[in-house]
């Protein structure tokens, strides 16, 4: 055994290395820093993300007055007169909904004329009823000094006449109320509101009485459709057909405005001012 005391003993080296590796494994199993480091990285990333979103919102609010949406544009007096179907359909469920008249299929002046005609018809019908019941028989009754209750025959003759006249008056009032309800915005659907906006566009931008095809009128009609579809798509994000139609209307409006800009620049400036657009918005609202 003394022969191997100073010699190389590999089995001792192997056992020593094995013991050292076991000690290192035990130390590593006791101290884990990977989860802590990853948690700090995620926390810093979330902080940077929140700061970026906050900064983006601040920039959006700062540019809200200077930069407008290339599709919707700025608010104008004509746009404020348009009826927005989605907002009206939501607001009319409230108890204090304002009563407003519509222009399509008839204006309020036409409705008043219809009501006046009903009043004339009622008056003429009342006169005919009086003649039919032979009111001349009433003149045969005793004078006013004599009480009507003392003459039962006269009371029986006047009572049916009073009932008929009262029924005719109630019927006329119901007809008048029905006409106003039919043409009230509260009982209108979205299609009627869109047609009302179309009629308003023709009245506001027509160059003459029968002008329905000028670029100004067509651009105004497209603008009313764009605003209505934009509100619809914001509340119905899965409506792909509505989004395609919105994109189509935007392209058609830009086409009309570019043509008007080429033909008559003064008319173009007046038109886009009423529509709430600018020259820059028209040129960059469609980039492809």
Swiss-Prot record:
One Gene Ontology CC term in the entry: mitochondrion
Range of the transit peptide: 1-50
Keywords tagged on the record: Mitochondrion, Ribonucleoprotein, Ribosomal protein, RNA-binding, rRNA-binding, Transit peptide
A Pfam family matched in the record: Ribosomal_S15
GO biological process terms, semicolon-separated: mitochondrial translation
Subunit structure: Component of the mitochondrial small ribosomal subunit (mt-SSU). Mature yeast 74S mitochondrial ribosomes consist of a small (37S) and a large (54S) subunit. The 37S small subunit contains a 15S ribosomal RNA (15S mt-rRNA) and at least 32 different proteins. The 54S large subunit contains a 21S rRNA (21S mt-rRNA) and at least 45 different proteins.
Family statement drawn from the similarity comment of this UniProt entry: Belongs to the universal ribosomal protein uS15 family.
Function: Component of the mitochondrial ribosome (mitoribosome), a dedicated translation machinery responsible for the synthesis of mitochondrial genome-encoded proteins, including at least some of the essential transmembrane subunits of the mitochondrial respiratory chain. The mitoribosomes are attached to the mitochondrial inner membrane and translation products are cotranslationally integrated into the membrane.
Protein's UniProt name: Small ribosomal subunit protein uS15m
Organism: Schizosaccharomyces pombe (strain 972 / ATCC 24843)
